[in-house]
Each structure stands twice: as structure tokens, then as C-alpha cells.
UniProtKB/Swiss-Prot annotation:
Alphabetical GO biological process terms: chemokine-mediated signaling pathway; inflammatory response; regulation of chemokine production
Keyword terms of this UniProt record: Disulfide bond, Endosome, G-protein coupled receptor, Glycoprotein, Membrane, Receptor, Transducer, Transmembrane, Transmembrane helix
Entry annotated with the keyword Cell wall biogenesis/degradation: no
Protein name: Atypical chemokine receptor 1
UniProt function note: Atypical chemokine receptor that controls chemokine levels and localization via high-affinity chemokine binding that is uncoupled from classic ligand-driven signal transduction cascades, resulting instead in chemokine sequestration, degradation, or transcytosis. Also known as interceptor (internalizing receptor) or chemokine-scavenging receptor or chemokine decoy receptor. Has a promiscuous chemokine-binding profile, interacting with inflammatory chemokines of both the CXC and the CC subfamilies but not with homeostatic chemokines.
Gene this protein is translated from: ACKR1
């Protein structure tokens, strides 16, 4: 994509003068098939990036707000008095806040306008933390929707640690393609997927499409199907599902961009390519904003949990039979 602040130098005026002096000696019918439109169509297509050098204040502001908001909600979740008032799966909410805080910390490193002597390992680490935390948050929300209330009631002991390690491990593996594809170019930490890493571009796009697009669609489809059939309430719907609104466009646009790059979809006009580039930038900006929105969503979940009664869950079969026995003896 091109850069609006530093456009490509246009010396067409000089070339046009030389061209007119050169062609004045030739008859008008010397180039019978010459078409000016064909020459313009063959010119390179330059897009104006929205997240260019001037977007550095946006990255810094989002980072500061995200760190402050995430730190505040973490302090509230870890308070001893508050943990007894929270009927939700508190460990999952804490992990979501930690993921949001980690993303907020590395946002300035990913900024377009932050130039300097960035080392490659720091760039790799920033992308690992950013996408690893994003994938982990998505998986945690899906896990919380399916098992959160049950785990909060203490009916699945010993499962939290294994699920936590597994989810964050899977998130780290899913972020490896973008980590290997990132590099420092002219002092900027960017994702290039150059050389032998070109294949990783499609793997990364597939991972984003699966986690940010297919996962929420699967949750919605399962919830709708179980509602129609009158089955169990799982997955439980809460305000945390709003989180996917910030990353759903990112998964869609990366998938579309991969189809265009692989020639599965042919973009024949420059305005269409420019529109796709703009959508990619808008989706990236919206995804970055999630680190500010996530603490607000967590605060709303905590408010609802502390002002409502704990969810009623079916008792296990063994516990029900034991209660019946006690009732018969009485």
C-alpha cells in the first residue's frame, strides 16, 4: 500500500514535455493502436494507508487507555472481598483482563509511526503477545460460554488449570505464523511474509478466520439450534460476545485478502484494490480498540454478577439421589 504522507514523486510533467518534443517528428498514424487508457490501466495502483505515520497518537492513546482500564478491572477482580461476591468463573475473567493488558502494552511497538532501531526479536515478541492474547481471549470467551457457569459453581474440580494452559498454548501456536512473518523494515515493526514465509500468510489468515469468524458463528448457531429444540441453555449468552465484533472484520478481511493474493478472486480495478486496502486498515484499527472495550465488557459482567443471584444449574445424579435418601429418612 502507498503512503499518503509520502506520495510517490510524480514527474509526469517533465516526461510529458519530452514526449511531446519526441513525437512531433512522427506522423499521427505512426502508432495506430496506441491507446492512452491502456497505459493508465497498466500504471501501478497506490493506496493511501489509514494507519500510516500520522496514526502514532492513535496507537499511543489506545495503549494508555487499555493499560489503565485493564489494570483497574484486574484490581477489582483480585480484591478478596469482591471474589466472594462474584458468581461467574472469576479465573476466566481475570485471564481476559490479563490478555487485554498484554495487548495494550505492545500496541506502541506495532505502530506505523514509531520508527527507530527496533530489533527483530522485539518485533517477533510484540506480534506473539498481540495475536497470542487475542486468540486466547477468543478461546476463553468460547470456553466461558460453554462451561463458565458450571465451573463457577465448582462442579468440575481440577479442570481450570488444564484448560488455562491448553487455551494459552493453542493461542501461542496459532500466532506463530504471524510471528515468523514479521520483520523490521526501515526501523518499523511490520508483517511482511516475505521470501519463504509467504505460505504463512495464508495459514495466519485461516487461523484468524477460524477463531474470529467461525467460532462466534458456531456459538450463535448452536445457541439458536438448542433454543429451537428446547435443549439445555448452553452456550450461555452474555455481554462478552460483543468482543467478537472488534475482531470479526479482521478475520473476514484477512481471508478476503488471501483469496485476492492467491488469484482465487480477481480484482481488476484499482478502486477495488484501494477499497480492500482501506477495509484492512479499518479492521485492524477496530481490532486494536478491543483492548479498551474488553475491560468495559468485563466491568459490565461483574456488575451483573454481583447484582443477581447465582445461576441455577442441574444437580449431579449422585447428589440428587443422596438428597432423596436423606429426605426419605426424615
Amino acid at each position: 500500500m502507498g503512503n499518503c504522507l509520502y506520495p510517490v514523486a510524480d514527474d509526469n510533467s517533465t516526461k510529458l514535455a519530452i514526449k511531446e518534443d519526441f513525437l512531433i517528428d512522427f506522423p499521427e498514424d505512426y502508432y495506430p493502436d496506441y491507446n492512452e487508457t491502456d497505459v493508465e490501466a497498466a500504471a501501478p495502483c497506490h493506496s493511501c494507508s489509514l494507519l500510516n505515520y500520522s496514526s502514532l497518537p492513535f496507537f499511543i492513546l489506545v495503549s494508555i487507555l487499555g493499560i489503565l482500564a485493564s489494570g483497574t478491572i484486574l484490581y477489582a477482580l483480585l480484591r478478596p472481598l469482591f471474589r466472594w461476591q462474584l458468581y461467574q468463573d472469576r479465573s476466566t475473567l481475570v485471564q481476559l483482563a490479563v490478555g487485554s493488558a498484554l495487548f495494550s502494552i505492545v500496541v506502541p511497538i506495532l505502530a506505523r509511526g514509531l520508527s527507530g532501531a527496533l530489533i527483530t526479536s522485539l518485533c517477533h515478541l510484540a506480534h506473539l503477545v498481540a495475536y497470542g492474547s487475542a486468540f486466547a481471549q477468543a478461546l476463553l470467551i468460547g470456553y466461558h460460554a460453554c462451561l463458565g457457569p458450571q465451573l463457577g459453581a465448582g462442579q468440575v474440580p481440577g479442570l481450570r488449570l488444564g484448560v488455562t494452559v491448553g487455551l494459552w498454548g493453542v493461542a501461542a501456536l496459532l500466532s506463530l505464523p504471524v510471528v515468523l512473518g514479521s520483520d523490521t523494515s526501515q526501523g518499523l515493526c511490520t508483517v511482511t511474509f516475505s521470501g519463504e514465509w509467504e505460505t504463512l500468510r495464508y495459514i495466519h489468515a485461516a487461523a484468524c478466520f477460524a477463531i474470529f469468524v467461525l467460532l462466534p458463528l458456531g456459538l450463535l448457531g448452536t445457541k439458536g439450534l438448542k433454543t429451537v429444540l428446547g435443549r439445555a441453555p448452553c452456550p450461555w449468552v452474555d455481554v462478552l460476545w460483543v468482543w467478537f465484533i472488534f475482531w470479526w472484520p479482521q478475520g473476514m478481511t484477512l481471508g478476503l485478502d488471501s483469496l485476492v493474493r492467491s488469484k482465487a478472486i480477481v480484482v481488476s480495478t484499482c478502486p477495488a484494490q484501494q477499497a480492500l486496502d482501506m477495509l484492512l486498515d479499518v479492521a485492524e484499527a477496530l481490532a486494536i480498540l478491543h483492548c479498551v472495550a474488553t475491560p468495559l465488557l468485563l466491568a459490565w459482567v461483574c456488575y451483573q454478577a454481583t447484582h443477581t443471584s447465582p445461576p441455577s444449574l442441574p444437580l449431579p445424579t449422585t447428589q440428587t439421589s443422596h438428597l432423596d435418601t436423606l429426605g426419605g429418612k426424615s
